[in-house]
Amino acid sequence: MRARYLLIGLVVVLAVVTGVLVYRGTRADTTPSGSPVTITPLSTAAADPQTAPFAEAGPDGSSTAAATGTAVPAGDRVASNVPMTKLSPGDTAPQFIIVSFDGAGSHTKWQEFLAAAAPTNSRFNGFLTGLYLLADENKNRYTGPGHAPGKSSVGFGGTTDEIATLIGDLNQAYAAGHEIGTHYNGHFCSGAEPSGNRWSAADWSTELDQFFGFFTNYRGNNPGADLPDLTVPADSVNGGRTQCLEGVWEELLPAWKAHGLTYDSSINAPAKGIVWPQKVDDIWEFYMPYIYSPGLGGSVILMDYNMWFKFNQGQDQPETAPELRGIVYDTYTSLYDQTYHGNRAPLLIANHFNNWNGNSFNEPTLRFMQDYCGKPDTYCATYSDVIAWMELQDPAVLQQLLDQPPVGAGA
């Protein structure tokens, strides 16, 4: 098993207008592990002013596990599953579902979701923590902005055998048409200062420099290791999600542009409900939706941990898993029905590879993919493919879609 780094303490953040979430925890994907996640809305839309410990699930591969994915040349990657057709005025858009997982380091979860996606030719997105390509013994090769060398809130990649397994998973996923994005590196959030909210444009650029360095120079950063080829092109990493959803837009933007990123999915929606992504300063922003869940009896940011905290304050109570799984699944299906019969905005299902609260989230997410990704006029897709579809449309037709009111906001 990989070493885990325990974060001690809890930062309580009060937010009346914008709302802030901070969560923290530890260990592998069988229990909460990792560091805080902070969600700070960009606007004055109602947010989820809850505070609780959070954990990001890290890599969990065995030191003896063999790399499952075969290194496939990029040219052999399967084609997009999204029909690239232009709408005429008044046509109905396809219903896109965008499933994503922050961290993307668990071999077990990669294999589960790859298997779930295959029968319906579906796609999902893994936002990789760059440090999972850096062995524990080489951790001093990373220096987070404002932090000491070798420091991280989510640990590192474990052994080189585990990194080889992860490379196999990434290759397999990319060859099957799934998308690899960035979840940056050290996961420094409020309480692990300086956190992302304090970083300058130069800091974010340094963080991305190191992410792409780990991505492209994984052999040089793990000298002597027998590692397979990573066949995922670095220039296919087009966007991602910031650690803890932190960061100031004006500081992030120059770093994104300097590294060729074209989208982000870290900012709370400017209104309650599910809306179409918007292009802001040449970056497609896929807003984190703040939705109403009947089963939870209120509104919540549509992310696994937020739903857990809304349910029982983020307490590990596996005996409640059947109830919570049902609530999560019903929330997803209700939102699908509202978007499908409403504005057809892409439905974002934001998760982590985890077994929190008795596997209360990955199980219903997997079941939702199996049940809904193959429905008529519905495509579980990558961010980049949805962007390609949107940019194919006539500007006036696309604007009509983007201007539609939100759905899923509740009363």
Each language-model region and where it sits:
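N-terminal pre-catalytic segment of deacetylase/amide-hydrolase enzymes
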Residues: 4-9, 14-99, 108-114, 118-119, ...
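Active-site beta->alpha N-cap acidic-glycine motif
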Residues: 69-179, 186-190, 214, 218-247, ...
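C-terminal domain-boundary segment and adjacent tail
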Residues: 80-82, 263-276, 329-411
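Well-ordered, non-membrane alpha-helical segments in soluble/globular domains
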Residues: 110-111, 159-167, 204-209, 324-334, ...
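Active-site-adjacent pocket scaffolds in enzyme catalytic domains
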Residues: 143-161, 227-343, 394-402
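Active-site cleft segment of glycoside hydrolase catalytic domains centered on the general acid/base Glu
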Residues: 191-210, 251
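A generic secondary-structure signal for well-formed alpha-helical elements
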Residues: 211-219, 260-263, 376
